[in-house]
């Protein structure tokens, strides 16, 4: 009787493992799926974000599946953290990006966070230089 029960449990366990299938680990930051179109840092969340700090300007490009998002009326704040130093920059709509003049030149390892409000929705993007 014990052998029959053991065989039933083993058979049931094998069937359950087959139904469950292989595990699938999934990272929802698809930064490796896309490339930055302007040479900046890329982050994907509610939208695709590209942050570029170059030539005295901070630029944030926002796209949705490769198509530019209308940034009319959008507001954004860029926070850059370098060690204990914190710099906040307000970004304003400018054509197909949000931008601001800046003198900051983040070093490797500095962190950046963008808080964006566009079309009544808020989202956050994080970057590492």
Model-based region annotation:
Residues 2-129:
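Intrinsically disordered, low-complexity terminal tails/loops enriched in metal-binding residues
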């Amino acid at each position: 009787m014990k052998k029959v029960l053991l065989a039933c449990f083993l058979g049931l366990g094998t069937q359950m493992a087959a139904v469950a299938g292989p595990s699938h680990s999934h990272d929802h930051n698809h930064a490796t799926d896309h490339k930055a179109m302007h040479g900046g840092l890329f982050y994907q969340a509610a939208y695709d974000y590209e942050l570029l700090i170059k030539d005295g300007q901070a630029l944030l490009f926002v796209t949705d599946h490769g198509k530019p998002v209308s940034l009319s009326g959008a507001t954004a704040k860029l926070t850059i953290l370098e060690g204990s130093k914190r710099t906040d920059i307000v970004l304003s709509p400018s054509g197909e990006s949000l931008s601001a003049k800046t003198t900051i030149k983040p070093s490797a390892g500095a962190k950046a966070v963008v808080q964006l409000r566009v079309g009544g929705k808020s989202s956050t993007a994080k970057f590492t230089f």
